[in-house]
Amino acid sequence: KGITVFDLLNIATGKKLNKKEACTILSKVGLCALEYVDREINDSLSGGELKRIEIATVIARNPKMAIFDEPEAGIDLWSFQNLTEVFKDLEMESQGITLVISHQERILQIADQIVLLEQGKLKKVGSKKEMLKLILQEPRCCQRKELEHE
């Protein structure tokens, strides 16, 4: 038998959870059915389910700061919508900071602040409203530069 979602949550927290505690953590990412607790981490889980389980392992630790690097990668649009709801809920109940790194414009809907980087350097920081206004007024400030082929 392989590693289960329950095993993974116990490893993530560093303590022995009971199944009710594990289910409570999973419910925070939209996996509230008790069936997920005993599921094996294998091909039977969708990409969206795996992403939410991955996020649940972070939430389970109750961090002061959580960093998610391109959490939307490899998931479909429906799973993406669920993922944005998870981040909105996480923001409302968390006392810490959640940093989401993404190249996808659609992730902007969950942002409080937006940081623009260019070639690894800080270009601009501002509120979502301020930065979206900048992007709309000066779209070239945020365009991806295509590599020139010789």
Regions found by a protein language model. Give the residues of each.
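Conserved catalytic loops of ABC-family nucleotide-binding domains
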Residues: V86-V100, L108
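Walker B catalytic motif
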Residues: E70-P71
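Q-loop/switch helix immediately C-terminal to the Walker
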Residues: G2-N18
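Conserved ABC ATPase "signature" region
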Residues: K19-Y36, E40
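Conserved catalytic segment of ABC-fold P-loop ATPases
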Residues: Q109-L116
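Hydrophobic anchor residue at the start of the ABC signature
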Residues: E54-I55
